[in-house]
Amino acid sequence: MSTMLIAVILLTLLALFFGVLLGFAALKFKVEGNPIVDELEAILPQTQCGQCGYPGCRPYAEAIANGDKVNKCPPGGTATMEKLASLMGVEPEPLNAEAQSQVKKVAYIREDECIGCTKCIQACPVDAIIGAGKLMHTVLTADCTGCDLCVEPCPVDCIDMVPVTQNLKNWNWRLNAIPVTLIQETPHEEKRG
């Protein structure tokens, strides 16, 4: 046998041995995550805004699993809070006074003043701001959670938080609240003549 063939076979056997060893170690020393934290995190809106007092949704989910209150997520609103309370088996509470706002606000960039520095784009946790370097930026209001993280880094102070005015596009129609009654059809008797 040639030296080259022996080297290839030896390296293949060595790679196979270490592959099996790593596979065994991965199964033997597997670290399980907390499934409750994963479920809580799936319920949270994933805005990573920090309005709850934690640096993101995962740390807040871990805090809830450790006994923290479920009413600290403003972007999620009452619906998210009720789902969290149901999962944790606690009574739903009103949203935290600091978290509760009567009118939803979104970021608004005064485009004529924007210098295109991209600092607001980098600060936005939900990618609701579009634009490019040295060009005007704008906010996708449908995606904006109102977390206010884009206002601080703006060097020219051209970002305002404005209330969302309700119109036909964003009105909460609550179609599931309309009462629906099922009417049973009764067979008609044939007319006799």
Swiss-Prot record:
Which E.C. number(s) belong to this protein? Answer: 7.-.-.-
Which UniProt keywords are listed? Answer: 4Fe-4S, Cell inner membrane, Cell membrane, Electron transport, Iron, Iron-sulfur, Membrane, Metal-binding, Repeat, Translocase, Transport
Domain 4Fe-4S: residue ranges: 32-90
The molecular function terms of the Gene Ontology recorded here are:
4 iron, 4 sulfur cluster binding; electron transfer activity; metal ion binding
Cofactors needed by this protein, per the record, are: [4Fe-4S] cluster
- Principal localisation: membrane
Q: Quick one: a GO biological-process term for this protein?
A: electron transport chain
Spell out the Gene3D superfamilies in the cross-references: 3.30.70.20, Electron transport complex subunit B, putative Fe-S cluster (1.10.15.40)
Query: A Pfam family matched by this chain, by name?
Result: Fer4_21
Where found in the cell?
Answer: Cell inner membrane
Q: Which family does it belong to?
A: Belongs to the 4Fe4S bacterial-type ferredoxin family. RnfB subfamily.
Entry protein name: Ion-translocating oxidoreductase complex subunit B
